[in-house]
From Swiss-Prot:
This is Elongation factor Ts. One of its GO terms (molecular function) is translation elongation factor activity. Gene3D superfamilies: 1.10.286.20, DNA helicase RuvA subunit, C-terminal domain, Elongation factor Ts, dimerisation domain. Belongs to the EF-Ts family. Keywords: Cytoplasm, Elongation factor, Protein biosynthesis. Associates with the EF-Tu.GDP complex and induces the exchange of GDP to GTP. It remains bound to the aminoacyl-tRNA.EF-Tu.GTP complex up to the GTP hydrolysis stage on the ribosome. The keyword Iron-sulfur does not apply. HAMAP family: EF_Ts. Residues 82-85 are annotated as: Involved in Mg(2+) ion dislocation from EF-Tu. SUPFAM superfamilies: Elongation factor Ts (EF-Ts), dimerisation domain (SSF54713), UBA-like (SSF46934). Pfam families: EF_TS. Its main location: cytoplasm. The lineage of its organism: Bacteria, Bacillati, Cyanobacteriota, Cyanophyceae, Oscillatoriophycideae. GO terms for cellular component: cytoplasm.
Length: 247
């Protein structure tokens, strides 16, 4: 059984929008398993679809660099201890230099990026250590992702905290940026409904069948309602089915 910590309760509150006591009770009953707690809350009708996990709570910034031909881009996350430092020009300058160097070297693993050489001849690791001495906070290159496109590539960073890269077949950079902006705002899980794993569909069906308004209904009615709700679920999580955020 995992410990029900304040951080776990906070995460569940952020993902469900429920109160502290409801979240704590759900986590205790789920023995500290946050995904199980979310499923139980949805089955009981207390919570709707929860936000997906995966966005780090650490402070920092995301920097993007795009190749000269516009066909390849990299996105790098650099973490700091405080938001104050994350907005510092020295920190942001370091993040942009790391992104440019990592793109040129085609490196995405933090350990590999550390050894990449910057324009001034120093390595990323040496520059990181110098920045730590200057700013007085721990700075970490956390992760990176690189993407290449056949036709056009879109990049979008929201508030320095959420970054998206989108590869298109056809279209142009403006369309790519619009799609990336939509992804940042709505966070689809897949591009097309057909990409949703069968295990995810079965889990969703189990949750829907357990909801209070399904109790006591004839099997054929339950199946009809289930079909409608699954279609709604697929539209909500699939990029091509979502209403465009700018409309």
């Amino acid at each position: 059984m995992a410990a029900v910590t304040a951080a776990l309760v906070k995460e569940l509150r952020e993902r469900t929008g429920l109160g502290m006591m409801e979240c704590k009770k759900a986590l205790v009953e789920a023995e500290g398993d946050i995904e199980r707690a979310i499923d139980d809350l949805r089955k009981s009708g207390q919570a709707k679809a929860a936000k997906k996990a995966g966005r780090t709570a650490a402070e920092g910034a995301i920097a993007v660099a795009v190749s000269g031909d516009g066909k390849t881009a990299i996105m790098v996350e650099i973490n700091s201890e405080t938001d104050f430092v994350a907005r510092d020009d020295n920190f942001l300058g370091f993040a942009n230099k790391v992104a440019e160097a990592a793109l040129a070297a085609a490196k995405t693993e933090a350990a590999d990026i550390a050894g990449v050489e910057l324009a001034d001849g120093s390595t990323v690791e040496q520059a990181r250590e110098a920045l730590i001495q200057k700013i007085g906070e721990n700075i970490q290159v956390r992760r990176a992702a690189i993407l290449s496109a056949e036709s056009a590539l879109g990049a979008y960073v929201h508030g320095g905290k959420i970054g998206v890269l989108v590869a298109l077949k056809g279209g142009d950079e403006a369309l790519g940026r619009d799609v990336a902006m939509h992804v940042a705002a709505v966070a689809p899980q897949v591009v097309n409904p057909s990409e949703v794993p069968e295990s995810d569909l079965e889990r969703e069906k189990e949750i829907i069948r357990a909801q209070p308004d399904m109790a006591g209904k004839p099997a054929e009615i339950v199946e009809k309602m289930l079909g409608g709700r699954i279609q709604k679920f697929l539209k909500e999580i699939s990029l091509v089915e979502q209403p465009f955020v700018k409309d």
